């Protein structure tokens, strides 16, 4: 990523969709305004007529939004699950597929068998699809290595991928994603490995900034999840959780008790869980791609989230098994069509609320003075166009820390 310049640059003659809730206009729209950028941050937002002299870039009336943030991805993995998907369409159960060596274990096996260079090459085109949609920050999880060596490998690849492509990274340790084959029948033993070895070692190496757990009947129990959260808390590491996707186990309350950044999926979230999230400031991360791909029918309780004013993020959940969609615009569209969000809520979900889900709400996700100068420039009249027509992606430019990529 190029270094931010100390010279002030004026991005002028723009229509700004600031996504700043302090403005009364929908999307925080400001007509004919300019962004003053210095040292990788937005110095000020002024009316174009009031912009000072100096180095300037004329945007010719183009739309500018905050850079998009994908706050939940599993971008690094080996292998493919396409044939498995075809089997499921033909009526073969996941249990049968898994018993025959498929399912998440096939991804674990392929990821373990891949070198860092191979994983980097596989991830590059996936990331490229997100960048073409204006993404400037994304979260990438581990969770297909499931041992110290391979979890380290995944996180190293995530860092290299971000460094090579002009995008900001939020890396998450998801070692508690599934029980690896060598611990079959001993999930508690594997959680001990996570808590005592994988988590502290990779934290000391500086490879991640938050910890996630798949808390579900087919994943880890609330008790096992809490062991991981306690280990993270002891080191001062923020937590988040895959919770209430397939059943209601009280995972949202558990995440909230540890002041988690986000509770993700949450199709089976109860009102008690929503209230707990409101109290703790935990973001609801909606993942409509997985809902669609699995042909689920139970939807997240969007009306309750609105009632309790819980921020709703929207993410791709890009992964090989349940959401093979590297398109944040498609996720926004699905969130509107399937979950009932408004387009403006969907935009907030991939900007300021996604930033909050990563603990970056004070620096990312809005066009505002003092915020990091991450923004996307569009050949479009209005933000709704990207939600309405996923796949078009009329991106003119992507700016990260003040530098066009």
UniProtKB/Swiss-Prot annotation:
Cofactor stoichiometry and binding remark: Binds 1 zinc or iron ion per subunit.
Entry EC no(s): 3.5.2.7
Intracellular or extracellular location(s): Cytoplasm
Catalytic activity: 4-imidazolone-5-propanoate + H2O = N-formimidoyl-L-glutamate
Keywords: Cytoplasm, Histidine metabolism, Hydrolase, Iron, Metal-binding, Zinc
Transmembrane segments: none
Positions contributing to N-formimidoyl-L-glutamate binding: 144, 319, 321
Residues involved in Zn(2+) binding: 72, 74, 242, 317
Gene Ontology, cellular component aspect: cytoplasm
InterPro entries attached to this UniProt entry: Amidohydro-rel (IPR006680), HutI (IPR005920), Metal-dep_hydrolase_composite (IPR011059), Metal_Hydrolase (IPR032466)
CDD domains: Imidazolone-5PH
Positions with a binding annotation for 4-imidazolone-5-propanoate: 81, 144, 177, 245, 322
Cofactors demanded by this protein: Zn(2+); Fe(3+)
Pathway participation: Amino-acid degradation; L-histidine degradation into L-glutamate; N-formimidoyl-L-glutamate from L-histidine: step 3/3
Molecular-function GO term, any one: iron ion binding
HAMAP family: HutI
Family indicated by similarity: Belongs to the metallo-dependent hydrolases superfamily. HutI family.
NCBIfam families: hutI
Function: Catalyzes the hydrolytic cleavage of the carbon-nitrogen bond in imidazolone-5-propanoate to yield N-formimidoyl-L-glutamate. It is the third step in the universal histidine degradation pathway.
Protein name: Imidazolonepropionase
Organism: Klebsiella pneumoniae (strain 342)
Protein's gene: hutI
